[in-house]
Curated annotation (Swiss-Prot):
Assembly and interaction partners: Interacts with the thyroid hormone receptor/TR (via the ligand-binding domain); this interaction requires the presence of thyroid hormone. Interacts with the androgen receptor/AR; in an androgen, testosterone and dihydrotestosterone-dependent manner. Interacts with ESR1 (estrogen ligand-bound); competes with UFSP2. Interacts with UFSP2; competes with ligand-bound ESR1. Interacts with DDRGK1 and UFL1; the interaction with DDRGK1 is direct. Interacts with NCOA1. Interacts with EP300. Part of the ASC-1 complex, that contains TRIP4, ASCC1, ASCC2 and ASCC3.
Cellular component, GO, one term: nuclear body
Any one Gene Ontology molecular-function term assigned to this protein's record: nuclear receptor binding
Numbered residues of crosslink Glycyl lysine isopeptide (Lys-Gly) (interchain with G-Cter in UFM1): 324-325, 334, 367
InterPro entries with a match to the protein in the record: ASCH_domain, PUA-like_sf, TRI4_N, TRIP4-like, TRIP4/RQT4_C2HC5_Znf, TRIP4_3rd_dom
UniProt name for this protein: Activating signal cointegrator 1
Species per Swiss-Prot/TrEMBL record: Homo sapiens (Human)
In-chain residues carrying the UniProt-annotated modification Phosphotyrosine: 289
Protein's UniProt keywords contain Flavoprotein: no
UniProt comment concerning the protein's domains: The C4-type zinc finger mediates a competitive interaction with UFSP2 and ligand-bound nuclear receptors. It also mediates interaction with the transcriptional coactivators and the basal transcription machinery.
Length: 581
């Protein structure tokens, strides 16, 4: 039948090949066309050719329909041909004879009679496509054994899908696909048969089955061999138990601190678990509205503190107008009403809420926090513009006692205040509060370069330490620059290197403000540089540092505070300045 079909279908095969090559530009061999024509269903032919042509629009659809029409016509001619029917009958008879030979061979095998039988050579069909290969394999398997189908959703089907690789490999099946070995007692990892018994792949702790654990507990030669076998890969894995390592002091301290925090957190969770019913109890629609103490993670002390603070603010807000204080100034003809303290409260953070957030509510107050219990005197603050202190000669004890008695405070308070005024030089160099002073050019650049050693002002400042220098927006004239350079050449010498440019409206660098002296004190203590300034008050500056990149900035009068971001960037851009002389 195959030979006759091939002979009768040769024109159709030739026609299909020519159409595919000329019309559609597909270089298709005749074997593929013969395979297409050997398909028994017209729908399968239409689907196959549609995939081959990648669509059925226009000429493609006409070619497919014409091919199916010619295929059906050719198939009818083959059926009507009596020669083909004879071929079919011969094939059926040959199949029956081969079956009878197989049955006879089995019977002879049972009776243990070895009779030589004629075996026809296997006629394997020509494999041209993957479909033919699958069909040939299916035919060969059907002769050998019966196919058994397994449901993939059953236990047996899941076992067939699971693949067990040789050796120990990480697996995340959690004992669902492979057999369970055990759980790691340190990290809790579920170890399956794929990972196998041995060191945990996460923490390195030994994990084995119950049978192996029983053998290890016997402490015999067999247990020693088993332990050596199980722990043989711990060196290669690079994971060793933490308890066996020698820790450095800072590592041990860090582990202890972490353990203490973990224990505190555990106690906190247990405490909240015990009191969860009382804390999560809802009264009416209380949870629908905001309340400061509604957070379930607050302790009893924090909750009571918040409730007390809320009552104070409510009384302050809804206080009677009769208790409001009004000041009548007859001399200035003004009526001053006391400001609402709520405005000040909303302009800053609440100390109670901030203490709860930082976890410092239960800590005792430090010495600086107890401002209401004992007076600390006047602390150094650049924002406090007070009268400058008078020069006191410490050699004369009588005058010192007289000055102490003349003051309104006691001797003990004055001595305590005097101690607060003492500032350590190392502390001044290490502390940088970001305070800045605006100076006109070209004096600002000379001050940052170290050529100008003092700065004169008409007001006193208690600030000591680092002081940033910002140039004002006013640009200097060339005449001012030349006159100032000539002056400092006379004061400092001819080998002074002056800056090439004098930028304005930017942050130049910083100096260390050592002292602020009056003109009289300045001439007494620094007679060699007294010619540089004749202002009422003189700032003594040392350690000048210039910035590599100047930041554009807008100045303010007197001493003012820099923006935090500009301050951080300025500290990173400082360079050490060489001395001018």
């Amino acid at each position: 039948m195959a030979v006759a079909g091939a002979v009768s279908g040769e024109p159709l095969v030739h026609w299909c090949t020519q159409q595919l090559r000329k019309t559609f530009g597909l270089d298709v061999s005749e074997e593929i066309i013969q395979y297409v024509l050997s398909i028994e269903s017209a729908e399968e032919i239409r689907e196959y050719v549609t995939d081959l042509l990648q669509g059925n629009e226009g000429k493609k659809g006409q070619f497919i329909e014409e091919l199916i029409t010619k295929w059906q016509k050719n198939d009818q001619e083959l059926i009507s041909d009596p020669l083909q029917q004879c071929f079919k009958k011969d094939e059926i008879l040959d199949g029956q004879k081969s079956g009878d030979h197989l049955k006879r061979g089995r019977k002879k095998g049972r009776n243990r009679q070895e009779v030589p039988a004629f075996t026809e050579p296997d006629t394997t069909a020509e494999v041209k496509t993957p479909f033919d290969l699958a069909k040939a394999q299916e035919n060969s398997n059907s002769v050998k054994k019966k196919t058994k189908f397994v449901n993939l959703y059953t236990r047996e089907g899941q076992d067939r899908l699971a693949v067990l690789l040789p050796g120990r490999h990480p697996c995340d099946c959690l004992g669902q696909k492979h057999k369970l070995i055990n759980n790691c007692l340190i990290c809790g990892r579920i170890v399956c048969e794929q990972e196998g018994s041995g060191p945990c792949l996460f923490c390195g702790t030994l994990v084995c089955t119950h049978e192996e654990q029983d053998i290890l507990q016997r402490d015999s030669n067999k247990s020693q061999k088993l332990l050596k076998k199980l722990m043989s890969g711990v060196e290669n894995s690079g994971k060793v138990d933490i308890s066996t390592k020698d820790l450095l002091p800072h590592q041990e301290l860090r582990i202890k601190s972490g353990l203490e925090k973990a224990i505190k957190h555990k106690d906190k969770l247990l405490e909240f678990d015990r009191t969860s019913i009382r804390r999560t109890q809802v009264i009416d629609d209380e949870s629908d509205y905001f309340a400061s103490d509604s957070n379930q993670w607050l302790s009893k002390l924090e909750r009571e503190t918040l409730q007390k603070r809320e009552e104070e603010l409510r009384e302050l807000r809804h206080a009677s107008r009769l208790s409001k204080k009004v000041t009548i100034d007859f001399a200035g003809r003004k009526i001053l009403e006391e400001e609402n303290s709520l405005a000040e409260y909303h302009s800053r953070l609440d100390e109670t809420i901030q203490a709860i957030a930082n976890g410092t509510l239960n800590q005792p107050l430090t010495k600086l926090d107890r401002s209401s219990e004992e007076p600390l005197g006047v602390l150094v603050n650049p924002n406090m513009y007070q009268s400058p202190p008078q020069w006191v000669d410490h050699t004369g004890a009588a005058s010192q006692k007289k000055a102490f008695r003349s003051s309104g405070f006691g001797l003990e308070f004055n001595s305590f205040q005097h101690q607060l005024r003492i500032q350590d030089q190392e502390f001044q160099e290490g502390f940088d509060g970001g305070w800045c002073l605006s100076v006109h050019q070209p004096w600002a650049s000379l001050l940052v370069r170290g050529i100008k050693r003092v700065e004169g002002r008409s007001w006193y400042t208690p600030h000591r330490g680092r002081l940033w220098i910002a140039a004002t927006a006013k640009k200097p004239s060339p005449q001012e620059v030349s006159e100032l350079q000539a002056t400092y050449r006379l004061l400092r010498g001819k080998d002074v290197e002056f800056p090439n440019d004098y930028p304005s409206g930017c942050l130049l660098g910083c100096v260390d403000l050592i002292d602020c002296l009056s003109q009289k004190q300045f001439k007494e203590q620094f007679p060699d540089i007294s010619q540089e300034s004749d202002s009422p008050f003189v700032f003594i500056c040392k350690n000048p540092q210039e910035m590599v990149v100047k930041f554009p900035i807008k100045g303010n009068p007197k001493i003012w505070k820099l923006d935090s971001k500009i301050h951080q960037g300025a500290k990173k851009g400082l360079m050490k300045q060489n001395k001018a002389v």
